[in-house]
A protein has these predicted regions:
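Active-site/ligand-binding surface loops and adjacent short beta/alpha elements
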Residues: 41-101
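Acidic, serine/threonine-rich low-complexity disordered tracts
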Residues: 1-41, 86-191
Length: 191
């Protein structure tokens, strides 16, 4: 039995939609680590200054670097993805994005694979747009397309269901509730 208790927190500027702060706490079986990014926008160019701190059992490291304003952490990237114009995408289209992971920026893609109806454990049904992100091969995933993200097919584009094939099995995440959306929840189907 392998226990994973990861927490991800991100703050994004409402005005600029740029990341401001990110923190993660990873607890995976006996492994643990904490990462923090503090972003500074000097407003003069296309880059953000990042103060990065990484704490793990072996010690703490701190560094500073600049990244493009197009790059951001995992949670902020998910928010940016919610703002894609899915209506203009065709099956097989790839939206490019830049992901900051630890102190490296990865140029990745999000492939639109079509639309599907999804039924969750609680019996609720959703119309979804399905995306397969390009993944960073490593300890967790065998292949670069082992993750599927099902996003509500409405103007909110909130994640409904996530399915991941991992080296040690399978992980799923599903929506339990959602409130305070900007638009009507038209992606949820009537029972």
């Amino acid at each position: 039995f392998y226990v994973v208790r990861d927490t991800f927190t991100s703050y994004i500027s409402k005005k600029t939609l740029l990341p401001v702060y990110y923190h993660d706490g990873k607890h995976e079986d006996s492994y643990w680590s904490y990462s923090t990014y503090l972003y500074t926008d000097n407003g003069k160019n296309d880059s953000l200054h990042v103060n990065f701190e990484y704490i793990k059992r072996k010690g703490t490291s701190r560094t500073e670097f600049n990244i493009s304003k197009k790059a951001c952490d995992l949670v902020a990237t998910c928010y940016k993805i919610r703002n894609l114009d899915v209506a203009s995408m065709s099956r097989g289209d790839v939206a490019a994005f830049s992901l900051l992971f630890e102190d490296i920026v990865y140029e990745l893609g999000l492939k639109f694979t079509g639309k599907e109806n999804v039924k969750l454990k609680d019996g609720s049904k959703y119309r979804t747009s399905v995306f397969v992100p390009t993944l960073i091969k490593g300890d967790l995933f065998k292949n670069d397309e082992d993750l599927k993200v099902y996003v509500a097919d409405d103007d909110n584009h909130y994640p409904v269901y996530v399915e991941a094939s991992l080296k040690m099995g399978k992980a799923v995440a599903s929506l339990e509730s959602i409130t305070g959306t900007k638009y009507e929840l038209s992606g949820k189907k009537k029972k």
